[in-house]
Amino acid sequence: MRKKTIVDGLEISYIEEGEGSPVLLLHGWGCNGGHWKAVIEGLKADHRVVAPDIPGFGESEEPPETWTTADFADFFEHFLAAIEMQDPVIIGHSNGGRISMMLASRSLARKVILTDSAGIKPHHSASYYAKVYSYKAMKKALSLPLLRDKKEAILDKYRGKTGSADYNAASPGMRRIMSTVLGEDFIPVLKQIKVPTLLVWGSEDTATPLSDGETMESVLKENGVDTALIVFEGRSHFAYLEECPRFISICKAFI
């Protein structure tokens, strides 16, 4: 069932199904709570499952300023209080994994499942940094009085050629947020997590590669966290959807 509530002045839309022990599902960039539909169906018989549209996605309002992942975590801490959900198991995909880790580091989760999660700062090629620096130089040059009127049109054309699909599809405000969160390093956050954490990864994930999951597993184990990495061979960044029945079975066993 779709519901709406106001949290920190923002209207947020979310799906809620079932009764029992609480489960919070946090989707990835460019997705919404509806992407968890099959997972919700698989868990709702024994659990109260909530899948929000993260602010800026789906039917939820966009953040009023450039939020960091910590700001999103603040928001969801208040959201959990608003819907009276305590100590949920949090399942996070991609960018939703960042928020899940932040909430877990604050002792707001009983357990965590991260599937193809973001959070390990990427190592880019020289050509990537060349694009970044050329973009910044172009942006500065276009601020000159003679070019100011054409600035946004030129930048939009450049972004269309060089930006990712998610970046190009986002609003200006969400683009700024994306640029901010992509630069965050979650190793320090991982070191603060104490609850059992399961990692589920597609072996062919090119957005957040399997090596990211291996790094997370290593950091968690070094800090004495009960953790394991399960690899879905031949699957991509959306491994949880590509093998949904298997993913649901794993979640049920872990929860």
Residue ranges and their predicted role:
Residues 7, 13-15, 51-91, 249:
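Active-site loop/oxyanion-hole signature of alpha/beta-hydrolase fold enzymes
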Residues 10-59:
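Conserved HGGG/HGGXW glycine-rich cap/lid loop of the alpha/beta-hydrolase fold
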Residues 98-105, 109-143:
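Flexible "cap/lid" loop of the alpha/beta hydrolase fold
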Residues 195, 209-219:
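Short alpha-helix in the alpha/beta-hydrolase fold that links the catalytic acid
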